Amino acid sequence: MNYLGDYCDVYLTHDSMSVRKAHNSGRNHLRNVVEYYQEIGHEKAQSVIDSITNSYAAEGQASSNPMLQQPGAPGAYPPPAFGFPGRPGMLPPPPPFGMPGAPPGAPPGGMIPLPGGRGMPPFPPPPPFGGTSGGPPMPGDLPPPPLPNMPSGNIPFPPPNGFPPNFQFPPPGAAGFPPPPIPGQGQTQSTSPGPGATGTPVPPPGFPLPGAPPLGQSAGITPPPGVPQKPASSPGPSQEGK
């Protein structure tokens, strides 16, 4: 099958781009083209040139991106103007970079910056332990952990900011605080009653109870002042036989 060449009556053996390029670059084809335009006249030749140019331009736009709908094509929606919403369910276009409405330092293209980045506020600081500074603890906060080897119910945990400068510590042995340990002995149990406790306090080991006779004497016998106390004597041999 033969194919007619461009602007001439020469038939080609193949309708391919390489064959047509080889034919159009030949000397016979160029001579035939010149004779063709001379025969049709200047006005008709200009109209033919314009129609060919427009067809090539339309084919070039369609071949560059055939999946993209050009504005004004059938079935294509025109882009919404700035400040007006688009189709239902479609996000409005972001303001261009540098136009009013865009924050200073915003990235181009309407991208959302990460928190803490340029154009966004920094991360909020974490809340302090135990509520705000100097205030009560926030609802739902856990109590602070107790110190190691600290008896429960004696000294409360200090506030978050520490004790005030004019805070006075109670003297040793006061109610609710253990007495100082005796040198050479381990930690002893507190003998002072706690706040609200009633009754006679229990003395430490080796000391008599309040109101009891001294060690070695029976109850009800109290020597007069100035008389030395006699230690309790063990029974003799004569008394053991009786």
Swiss-Prot record:
Position of the signal peptide: none
Task of the protein: Component of the spliceosomal U1 snRNP, which is essential for recognition of the pre-mRNA 5' splice-site and the subsequent assembly of the spliceosome. U1-C is directly involved in initial 5' splice-site recognition for both constitutive and regulated alternative splicing. The interaction with the 5' splice-site seems to precede base-pairing between the pre-mRNA and the U1 snRNA. Stimulates commitment or early (E) complex formation by stabilizing the base pairing of the 5' end of the U1 snRNA and the 5' splice-site region.
Sequence segments annotated as region (Disordered): 60-242
Assembly: U1 snRNP is composed of the 7 core Sm proteins B/B', D1, D2, D3, E, F and G that assemble in a heptameric protein ring on the Sm site of the small nuclear RNA to form the core snRNP, and at least 3 U1 snRNP-specific proteins U1-70K, U1-A and U1-C. U1-C interacts with U1 snRNA and the 5' splice-site region of the pre-mRNA.
SUPFAM superfamilies, per the entry: beta-beta-alpha zinc fingers (SSF57667)
A biological process term (GO) from this entry: spliceosomal snRNP assembly
Keywords: Metal-binding, Nucleus, Ribonucleoprotein, RNA-binding, Zinc, Zinc-finger
Zinc finger residue extent: Matrin-type: 3-35
Name the record gives this protein: U1 small nuclear ribonucleoprotein C
Biased composition (Polar residues): 231-242
Compartments it resides in: Nucleus
Gene Ontology CC terms: commitment complex; U1 snRNP; U2-type prespliceosome
Comp. bias (Pro residues): 90-107, 136-149, 156-183, 201-213
GO molecular function, one term: pre-mRNA 5'-splice site binding
Predominant place of localization: nucleus
Superkingdom of origin organism: Eukaryota
Record bears the keyword Zinc: yes
